[in-house]
Amino acid sequence: MPLFLILCLLQGSSFALPQKRPHPRWLWEGSLPSRTHLRAMGTLRPSSPLCWREESSFAAPNSLKGSRLVSGEPGGAVTIQCHYAPSSVNRHQRKYWCRLGPPRWICQTIVSTNQYTHHRYRDRVALTDFPQRGLFVVRLSQLSPDDIGCYLCGIGSENNMLFLSMNLTISAGPASTLPTATPAAGELTMRSYGTASPVANRWTPGTTQTLGQGTAWDTVASTPGTSKTTASAEGRRTPGATRPAAPGTGSWAEGSVKAPAPIPESPPSKSRSMSNTTEGVWEGTRSSVTNRARASKDRREMTTTKADRPREDIEGVRIALDAAKKVLGTIGPPALVSETLAWEILPQATPVSKQQSQGSIGETTPAAGMWTLGTPAADVWILGTPAADVWTSMEAASGEGSAAGDLDAATGDRGPQATLSQTPAVGPWGPPGKESSVKRTFPEDESSSRTLAPVSTMLALFMLMALVLLQRKLWRRRTSQEAERVTLIQMTHFLEVNPQADQLPHVERKMLQDDSLPAGASLTAPERNPGP
């Protein structure tokens, strides 16, 4: 009986579901020199319904930080930031951006720092690395519904080392564009991230877009998404298309000029906007705001297209020269812009402090009775309470500010403030002449070594031939010297074997003298007797 129970228990354990074991190639979080830091395995959870990947719970200095959700529009572009620890190992590592599936466990490389770009993403994807700042940025343009999916940005020689997963979504609505007609003298275009709350007089996540022309303004109640309101000269309410927004994503979606546009829902108040060339008085009730603008004839264009700004290669911002085109990725306050009221993009790439980047959302100051809304180190707007009723536009050109000021702040730590980040990278990143000089030794760089291999082989052959010729020459010279020496020895031996007469011994010399004939003797031959 006990044996039967044991067999039943063993059989039941064999039918139990096997526990999922981690894949061996996911055990390493990063390619550290000592290979001693193992990755702490987490649970499988989706960052979105489309992206299932094991998230890293490894909080070591090699962990990556960035946005988990990226949203864009069809035909637009998105910019993705991946922060990493600026250590000596990570600076020289390969940076990559890949797409998961199909199958789901394979991540196909789209672009990497080894000068590799997938053929399907040519001319519309770029990866820029900033080793000194611990950041690399990926920009994908010409978005389409086919780009929806899960992506990984990571560091390492393979696509399964140190990575961060994210989900890319494309909104269903079309991209918003400015009207094709030339703006009139009294037109003012404003777009903003965030919606106005009439109760607390503060901003909540969302996007409010307001297009106004003429002297009368109508508004639409603020919604958590993106609302668009157009006001005509007759003062009728014309609500535009509404599209969803993804607050707190930490990435940028390119659109038109964006600026804070508060929607007054409080008791009647008056606001005043002052600039060098235009003066507007804003009078509002619960449902309407009146805008009156006066401008001279030579300053009839009042839209914030920023066409008169100098282009800075350091920021890579494309500015549309025509009002009908989209102005890419601009975040700033509304202003009655003229030729003398142009924003300047500072040519520095110095990161701002985290406190400065967090100041991009308006906060209520009870002592002063005012709240401030601005972007990091760029433009600061001060909006007075109904008692003050004054808008003051000023530009804070701080020495530490730049369009890329919030790149060093971790996107995942900012939450909804990430929607107020600075202008995305459209062109080359970083100051000119300071490009990355990182040495890379990866499979894509083997072409240079293959080119140098034949040259080194030829040099080795030439050296070998020279050594052989030199050895033969030395051998011939040595052989000739030995031949001369042998000849000299033979001649000396011959002279010793055949001595002269004066060198013979005394007895032999006497015998030779005795055998010689006397001086008077002569030899005579006998005469023959001739016969008869």
Swiss-Prot record:
What this protein is reported to do is described as: Functions as a receptor for the Fc fragment of IgA and IgM. Binds IgA and IgM with high affinity and mediates their endocytosis. May function in the immune response to microbes mediated by IgA and IgM.
Q: Which organism is it from?
A: Homo sapiens (Human)
GO CC annotations on file: plasma membrane
> Listed disulfide bonds for this chain?
C82-C153
Q: Which Gene3D superfamilies does the UniProt record give?
A: Immunoglobulins
Instruction: Output compositional bias ranges, type Basic and acidic residues.
Output: 295-311
Name this protein carries in UniProt:
High affinity immunoglobulin alpha and immunoglobulin mu Fc receptor
Gene Ontology molecular function: transmembrane signaling receptor activity
